[in-house]
Amino acid sequence: MFKKTILFTAKRTQEKADLEIELQQIASKYTFAPKIHKVEKFPDRYEVTMDKIDNMCLADMYSDDPKKIPQRIWTQIHAILTILYEREGIEYIDITGYNFIEQDNKVYIIDFGDARYKTDKINWFLKDFLSGQYEWNPDFA
């Protein structure tokens, strides 16, 4: 198990933290993200207990350079983000090598702090990514 603290700030309000937890719970139903077991609520933060994925992120495992990420990894990331977008209406835009972990040949997505439900206009980078342009999002570099 792993415990993550989500502090409430001017930028990350309690409502935003609620959304982050909700979206990760949805992704975990597909086994795309660590399962959340417990959320402890405090006036200034949440303490979230979840499954621990005991491996390095893709950037540390392979490189920060998207060209060094194996195609099988890109294929899994594309499948994860497509399902979250098309079935659940989730726009996950923080697409960097630091927010994906590979364990036992399976890719997991972490950090839903910048994820959101889709709006009338899809995020420009997610649109390109879902169309097959496999790069890391420069807005989060």
Describe every region a protein language model picked out.
Residues 54, 97, 114:
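Short, glycine/acidic-enriched loop or turn micro-motifs at the edges of active sites
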Residues 90, 103-141:
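C-lobe/activation-segment region of protein kinase-like
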Residues 1-21, 25:
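ATP-binding glycine-rich loop module of kinase domains
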Residues 28-32:
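Flexible N-lobe loop architecture of eukaryotic-like protein kinase catalytic domains
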Residues 80-87:
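Conserved hydrophobic alpha-helix
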Residues 87-97, 102:
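Catalytic-loop of the protein kinase fold
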Residues 35-73:
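Conserved structural core of kinase catalytic domains
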